[in-house]
Design a protein with these regions (language model features):
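Small/polar loops that bind or transfer phosphate-bearing groups
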Residues: 74, 174-175, 455
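Acidic/histidine-enriched segments that form metal/cofactor-coordinating
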Residues: 42, 50-160, 197-212, 219, ...
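His/Glu-rich zincin catalytic helix
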Residues: 1-49, 158-283, 324-435, 465
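Small-residue-rich helix-loop
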Residues: 455-460, 468
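Structured beta->alpha junctions
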Residues: 21, 76-78, 456
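Catalytic adenosine-cofactor/nucleotide-binding cores of aminoacyl-tRNA synthetases and other
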Residues: 450-452
Length: 476
């Protein structure tokens, strides 16, 4: 094994895998691979392992993919359980082949996810800018455009993972465990991968098909982009809120592109000359790389900070490089593109849920990762509720159901926590998410009541009826 293993001294039992996952196009292949890593593997075949574990234990596990890197993290209460999570993640990372149904269902999940994000104006603007920018320094949409995502195949996944999801590209930063124990845990995940052959084909490049609506408009909105080195990004973003008060059309990218640069954008031509003159006079200071993944648990952020300190980047900047510099000395003429129109994408769902079945598997065995978990398994341990769902709590009152657009919340009372613990371990409970019928779902307890929620759901009444039927059947 030639994976890079780094042990960091900190009290938490935590680990994070990092590996390159460049966005080669607008398909979101790195995003799809991220979903598939958690979905299934030869050691952990059940599609709901992740959901059951994070709902019933104090473990934390998630991932995030940017334009050039993917991060997979885990945090547990004991070293034994952290090593189990590492084995689970590593096995998923090394898995290359998937059933067509798994790929199509995760595509559907991502389409629901992208539709969920598309409700936010800032996301729409960013997507329009990226889709309309065809310069060599342009960002590729690592989350994917729905109409491009659909083209990805099992062969593309195999080719992509064989190129990037390999040991010599992989690093793990961990605390609370020993290096040799990590090697042992990962070797378990390698048993069925020893004879993996190299996939010699490159993943196909998929880009949006240009249509008349994309390129022609009565009044196309221009976008002017000035590109700066990544070391100035933190300085620009610190000043951005103040700048935007004066210039509402100003937009600053929060990620780096494949060349390690970021863009300062100006949308439209209103007062463009004045803005250009003003921008050239602003000053910035070179700094270290920005903190990564600030939404991750603090223990994971500490591990990632250790990763940065292990790079070859110079730590001591000279006083000259630390001095404030006018932006005019750092930029060339702006690149000019246009806001693209975003196509309307219909989410095609072929899966259905049987609402009449009397065998809803509420007594099914727990998934593999729960069987092997050494810590406590209890419904209330993993209680979690996102802010978007908590907003529905104020409106549900004495009602059993609250629906707002693609968000929903169901209240169950009374039902025992022991019974709910059993239900949440079943594949039947997670069927709407696993089959790609919504973006995400979850369950939590509050003041003695049980709540089940869903988000990014284009057919909320169907999935609500299914969950209600499932819970009702378990009480007879």
């Amino acid at each position: 094994m030639i994976m890079n293993i780094h042990i960091v001294e900190q009290p938490e039992f935590a680990a994070v895998f990092t590996l390159p996952s460049p966005a080669r196009d607008h398909s979101g292949i790195g995003h799809l691979v991220e979903h598939l890593v958690f979905r299934t593997s030869h050691l952990f075949p059940e599609r709901h392992n992740l959901f059951a574990l994070t709902s019933l234990t104090q473990c934390k596990m998630n991932a995030s993919t940017t334009g050039d890197t993917s991060y997979y993290f885990a945090q547990a209460q004991t070293s034994e359980d952290l090593l189990l999570l590492i084995e689970y993640l590593y096995t998923g990372l090394m898995t290359r082949t998937y059933k067509e149904s798994d790929i199509e269902q995760e595509k559907s999940v991502i389409q629901h996810e992208l539709a969920f994000y598309a409700k936010h104006p800032a996301y729409q603007t960013q997507s329009q800018i990226w889709r309309g920018d065809h310069h060599s320094c342009a960002y590729q949409h690592w989350g994917g455009f729905p109409d491009v995502l659909t083209h990805l195949t099992a062969n593309d996944i195999d080719a992509y993972k064989s190129q990037y999801y390999v040991d010599h590209q992989l690093s793990i930063f961990a605390s609370g465990i020993l290096k040799e124990d990590i090697v042992t845990a990962c070797n378990k995940g390698r048993l069925n991968h020893a004879k993996l052959s190299n996939h010699h084909n490159q993943p196909k490049i998929y880009q949006p098909k240009l249509t008349t609506n994309d390129t022609e408009d009565d009044m196309p909105v221009p976008v002017f982009s000035w590109w700066l080195a990544g070391k100035y990004q933190a300085s620009v973003l610190r000043q951005f809120p103040k700048w935007q008060i004066q210039w509402p059309e100003l937009y600053v990218e929060e990620e780096l592109n494949h060349q390690g640069m970021f863009a300062i954008r100006y949308v439209g031509e209103k007062e463009l000359s004045q803005f250009s003159t003003w921008l050239a006079c602003q000053t910035v200071i070179a700094g270290s790389e920005m903190t990564k993944m600030t939404k991750f648990p603090e223990s994971i952020q500490a591990l990632l900070s250790s990763e940065i300190s292990n790079t070859s980047q110079p730590r001591n900047l000279s006083s000259k490089s630390n001095a404030a510099m006018p932006i005019s000395q750092l930029i060339d003429e702006p690149c000019i593109s246009h806001l693209a129109r975003l196509p309307i994408t219909n989410i095609h769902t072929t899966q259905t849920l049987d609402l009449t079945s009397t065998t809803l598997a509420t007594a099914a065995e727990p998934p593999t990762i729960i069987k092997r978990f050494t810590g406590a398994i209890a419904f209330e341990l993993g209680s979690y509720q996102p802010k978007t769902i908590m907003q529905l709590l104020a409106d549900i009152g004495d009602k059993e159901i609250c629906i707002k657009a693609d968000l929903w919340l169901i209240k169950f009372t009374p039902i025992s926590l022991e019974k709910m613990t059993a239900i949440v371990q079943t594949s039947a409970f997670w069927a709407p998410r696993v089959r790609g019928l919504l973006y995400t779902m979850g369950v939590f307890e509050l003041a003695g009541d049980i709540y089940v929620w869903g988000a990014g759901d284009i057919q909320p009444t169907t999935n609500i009826s299914y969950i209600q039927a499932l819970i009702d059947s378990s009480q007879h």
